[in-house]
Amino acid sequence: KYKLAAGKTAKSILISCGARLAPFDIQEVRDVTAYDELQLDTLGDKKTALFLIMSDTDATFNFLISMIYTQLFNLLCEKADDVYGGRLPVHVRCLIDEAANIGQIPNLEKLVATIRSREISACLVLQAQSQLKAIYKDNADTIIGNMDSRIFLGGSEPTTLKELNQALGKETIDTYNTSNTRGNSPSYGMNYQKLGKDLATVDELSVLDGSKCILQLRGVRPFKSDKYDLTQHPNYKYTSDCDKK
């Protein structure tokens, strides 16, 4: 098909291809992608930890992370169906921190809905929901809708706060109004009524205590909870935060 293209069209194809593949001109990138040493299809066979670490200030090579996740989901889904009868023997949990900075994972809106049945889950960590919408456009709502749980750790991004405020709904409060008139004909009155009030206003959410979080689980009303104190974890002593050596 390339050879059938007109001269100018063929040149445009070459220029576009060269621009997209430019990172592979770097020898280190070619070395990393020359052969497979990750064995992604084995992650669901036994307990394994795989760390994918990229620069949080330079997005040049973030596409590599996106490629890895795409291959990971495809390989594990195929293995779950073809080898294990639909479910991996060991649950694979993907903790995708700074999910907005790794580039777009193709068909993520479909994957998050289908990988769960194969014992695979994805946890997207974002600074704000608007980041997800900036990358996945209209599919962002589908991705969020397919998440069984959502945790708000705090923030001040207006769109996120407004959507959380609406999701929390309202509570019913009792109000009592009293009136007292003094003078020649004193009188006293009391009025009682029920009113609807936002469970948490946008204002209140923006100043959420740093030690608190709001958890939304499917089928359960949202609730406020304490954040887990990592320093109390039995393995905290093995982390670099505890031991600077």
Residue ranges and their predicted role:
Residues 126:
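H-loop/switch region of ABC-family ATPase nucleotide-binding domains
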